[in-house]
UniProtKB/Swiss-Prot annotation:
Sorted UniProt keywords: ATP synthesis, Cell inner membrane, Cell membrane, CF(0), Hydrogen ion transport, Ion transport, Membrane, Transmembrane, Transmembrane helix, Transport
A GO cellular component annotation in the UniProt record: proton-transporting ATP synthase complex
Keyword flag Zinc-finger: no
Membrane-protein topology: Multi-pass membrane protein
Protein localization: Cell inner membrane
Record-stated family: Belongs to the ATPase A chain family.
PROSITE patterns, A to Z: ATPASE_A
Function (record text): Key component of the proton channel; it plays a direct role in the translocation of protons across the membrane.
Species for this entry: Rhodopseudomonas palustris (strain BisB18)
HAMAP family linked: ATP_synth_a_bact
Protein name: ATP synthase subunit a
Length: 249
């Protein structure tokens, strides 16, 4: 059977240089990050260039993406949250496009690596932390003290709030990583059954119909998951940014 884990191997394409004895290399992961950025850039440039009253497909996709993210920010972080639109939009589009590119056979899914999702989650966490203190000063600590909590259980509640706050980047990154990893492993496993069964002759061809159907169904499901995981990451980012914007509310 084909190794379902092999698709996640990071392979060096060429060496860029060395820093402190550590090799800096351009890998397949780096290449697909550039592919994702290129696709997003082409979509947005194509949507803006030659705008028409009756939008075409590219313009419609760009406008729908823009309005969808802007609406998500307004509903979770308020109008003030729109100052973070470039961050949230970039994260949403980068994750969604990366997820969808990874569904194409023989490509690479960069979001199936924890180091990538952890870097994105830490970016959000540090943005919330830095802006929270910049905007609110020590008043940012109010997010750890929910209003209306009885005094006798307040220390426990504060401990839980602080603990959950510092767990945010872990849960934020692992959720995306685990979903993409599990989905692609399942796809690879079912896909590997198709040539194995087809090699058994006529009976095998009939038997291969079931895993083929599963692959088609899982691919459709993975397309949905690719969007949903990008949306979940974006909306959690908005919720966390809301804490920095409205500490203590």
């Amino acid at each position: 059977m084909i190794d379902p884990i092999h698709q996640f191997n990071i392979e060096k394409i060429f060496t860029i240089g060395h820093i402190g004895g550590q090799e800096i290399a351009f890998t397949n992961s780096s290449a697909y990050m550039l592919v994702a950025v290129a696709v997003i850039s082409l979509l947005m440039i194509g949507g803006v260039a030659g705008r028409q009253m009756v939008p075409g497909r590219i313009q419609s996709l760009a406008e729908i993406s823009y309005e969808f993210v802007a609406g998500t920010i307004r509903s979770t972080a308020g109008v003030e949250g729109l100052k973070f639109f470039p961050l949230v939009f970039s994260l949403f589009m980068f994750i969604m496009i990366s997820n969808m590119v990874g569904i194409i056979p023989y490509t690479f899914t960069i979001t199936s690596h924890l180091i990538v999702t952890a870097a994105l989650a830490l970016l959000v966490f540090l943005t919330v932390l830095i802006y929270g203190f910049y905007r609110n000063g020590l008043g940012f600590f109010k997010i750890f003290v929910p209003s209306g909590v009885p005094v006798f259980i307040l220390p426990l509640v504060v401990f839980i709030e602080v603990f959950s706050f510092f767990l945010r980047p872990i849960s934020h990154s692992v959720r995306l990583f685990a979903n993409m990893l599990a989905g692609h492993i399942a796809l690879k496993v079912f896909a590997s059954f198709i040539p194995l069964l087809a090699g058994l002759g006529i009976a095998g061809y009939f038997g291969a119909v079931l895993p083929l159907g599963m692959v088609i169904a899982l691919t459709a499901l993975e397309l949905l998951v690719a969007f949903l995981q990008a949306y979940v990451f974006a909306i959690l980012t908005c919720i966390y940014l809301n804490d920095a914007l409205h500490a203590g509310h």
